[in-house]
């Protein structure tokens, strides 16, 4: 396909137009008085959101050069979202500011490669300064503050803080859509997996259609049990002890299942059978997790163990097990604490090594089931449009909270960037163009406060001057339009989010400045449509 090529200033300016179109769309959402953006969807209702990355992903521009610029800045938002889960609007805004100031200097004759070096120096200094003032998240109150600011809703903040308190920092918190109007929290303590009883005759509570086993033995195997003779010696030992049994197997069918059900109905023996969770290698890992959690062994031919040789000592046990039609929950497994700890450490290592997002998510779920628990935030609203918007805000708040637990918190509302300005200004270089790069970051660091003020209908320059001349930590509360100690009133941002936003913005923007040529496809003109058939002409008698 034929290409069109733009050079130098013309190429950079065309791409900058695209950057501005995307950033100007996203930045109206910043701060407590930021507005929403409505996105048209091909199917279903339009989406109303203030999530920077969701807005950026929807933007495609007609002009190929403008679109190139927009796609580059879209990468800033996407990368920040991947790393920190929030801060995408700030990252987009910073990228726009660095590109705008950088292009002015490149046009004036500065060397973009040296400017890039200056930008890198200033960003490193800023990150160093942010880490110095960062404070650790202490307790539920700090978590609630971070989530409240991210979601712009104290109720959501409290909900996420409750969830984190119940499942711990290692726990998994998922967000689901609810059929009801309200938003509620559902916490699953212990290990839950999505497999229910194999026969409804196994239930112990007819009203709830659940089977609850107190202090049961747990047989864990990856084999299919069809012949009752295979496990008969084991069942006899368990009946003698008057205990209950949970069987987790590849499948229990035919004669074996019928025998277990008949004995349950007669009251001879209480046993529930469920299928093993997961598939393939993941199933083996999950069975091993259950075995370690309950202090049992996985009965598998791979490990040289046969069902007929199983003794009671090979079984796991737990305080209680609850089995519904769809889920099995093991509460307080009686496994060795040090073995569980070692398994958790092993999974953590795998999480760090994996490059697949899907694998990482599944490993984190396994980690949560072993180390903490699982909490589900069920989001409800009056309409589907509000539901989707609320769900996105909760997901952002959740990501911000996890980032805060990892690297701590700093003063919010762009205040932290202003607080590190004096240290960045101290950076000097004998090379004038490197100094230009440093000065670009100095100016860009003011941009978040300026935009938050603009979205509140105020003049940013006056506010920035006041913050610079105040003590560190004093910032501008745009919601109530007053100057406050940001940390003490709970206006905080996660250090990881603030750091990632600047690093990703600077990375893409400084590379953008080094562009000297842009190559794009020549848009195809619409081809004329095929002429239609003459009126009245049939298909020549063909059927």
Curated annotation (Swiss-Prot):
Location relative to the cell: Cytoplasm
Reaction catalysed by this enzyme: ATP + H2O + a folded polypeptide = ADP + phosphate + an unfolded polypeptide
GO biological process, one term: protein refolding
PROSITE patterns: CHAPERONINS_CPN60 (PS00296)
EC class name: isomerase
Keyword Transmembrane helix in annotation: no
Keyword Translocase appears in the UniProt entry: no
Disulfide feature: none
Name by which UniProt lists this protein: Chaperonin GroEL
Annotated organism of origin: Clostridium acetobutylicum (strain ATCC 824 / DSM 792 / JCM 1419 / IAM 19013 / LMG 5710 / NBRC 13948 / NRRL B-527 / VKM B-1787 / 2291 / W)
Taxonomic lineage of the native organism: Bacteria, Bacillati, Bacillota, Clostridia, Eubacteriales
Gene name of the encoded protein: groEL
């Amino acid at each position: 396909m034929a290409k069109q090529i733009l050079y130098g200033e013309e190429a950079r300016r065309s791409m900058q137009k695209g950057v501005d179109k995307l950033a100007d769309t996203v930045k109206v959402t910043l701060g407590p008085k930021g507005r929403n953006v409505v996105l048209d969807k091909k199917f279903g209702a339009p989406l109303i959101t203030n999530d920077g990355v969701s807005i950026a992903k929807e933007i495609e521009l007609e002009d190929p050069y403008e679109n190139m610029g927009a796609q580059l800045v879209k990468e800033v938002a996407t990368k920040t979202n991947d790393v920190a889960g929030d801060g995408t609007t700030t990252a987009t805004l910073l990228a726009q500011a660095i590109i705008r100031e950088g292009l002015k200097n490149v046009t004036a004759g500065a060397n973009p490669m040296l400017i890039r070096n200056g930008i890198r120096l200033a960003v490193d200094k800023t990150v160093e300064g942010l880490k110095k003032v960062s404070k650790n998240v202490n307790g539920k109150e700090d978590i609630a503050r971070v989530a409240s600011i991210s979601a712009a809703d104290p109720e959501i903040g409290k909900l996420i803080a409750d969830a984190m308190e119940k499942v711990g920092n290692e726990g998994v918190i998922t967000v689901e859509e609810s059929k009801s109007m309200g938003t509620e929290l559902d916490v699953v303590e212990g290990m839950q997996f999505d497999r229910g009883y194999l026969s409804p005759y196994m239930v112990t509570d007819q009203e709830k259609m659940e089977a609850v086993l107190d202090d049961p033995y747990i047989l864990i195997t990856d084999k299919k049990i069809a012949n009752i003779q295979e496990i008969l010696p084991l069942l006899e030992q368990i009946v003698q002890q008057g205990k209950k049994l949970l069987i987790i197997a590849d499948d229990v069918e035919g004669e074996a299942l019928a025998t277990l059900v008949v004995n349950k109905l007669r009251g001879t023996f209480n046993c529930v059978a469920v299928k093993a969770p997961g598939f393939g290698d993941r199933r083996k890992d999950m069975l091993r997790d259950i075995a370690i959690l309950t202090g049992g062994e996985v009965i598998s031919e791979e490990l040289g163990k046969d069902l007929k040789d199983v003794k009671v000592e090979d079984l796991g046990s737990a305080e209680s097990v609850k089995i519904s039609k769809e889920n099995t929950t093991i509460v307080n497994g009686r496994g060795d604490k040090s073995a569980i700890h070692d398994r958790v450490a092993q999974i953590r290592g795998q999480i760090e090594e994996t490059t697949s997002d899907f694998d990482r998510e599944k490993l984190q779920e396994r980690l949560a089931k072993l180390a903490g628990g699982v909490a589900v935030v069920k989001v409800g609203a009056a309409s589907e449009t509000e539901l989707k918007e609320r769900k996105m805000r909760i997901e952002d708040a959740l990501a911000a909270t996890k980032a805060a637990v990892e690297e701590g918190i700093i003063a919010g509302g762009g205040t932290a960037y202003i607080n590190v300005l004096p240290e960045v200004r101290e950076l000097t270089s004998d090379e004038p163009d490197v100094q230009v790069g440093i000065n670009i970051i100095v100016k860009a660091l003011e941009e978040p406060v300026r935009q938050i003020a603009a979205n509140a209908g105020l003049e940013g320059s006056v506010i920035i001057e006041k913050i610079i001349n105040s003590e560190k930590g004093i910032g501008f509360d745009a919601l109530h339009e007053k100057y406050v100690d940001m940390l003490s009133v709970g206006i905080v941002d996660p250090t990881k989010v603030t750091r990632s936003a600047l690093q990703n913005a600077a990375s893409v923007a400084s590379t953008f400045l080094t562009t000297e040529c842009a190559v794009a496809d020549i848009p195809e003109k619409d081809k004329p449509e095929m002429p239609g058939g003459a009126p009245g002409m049939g298909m020549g008698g063909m059927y």
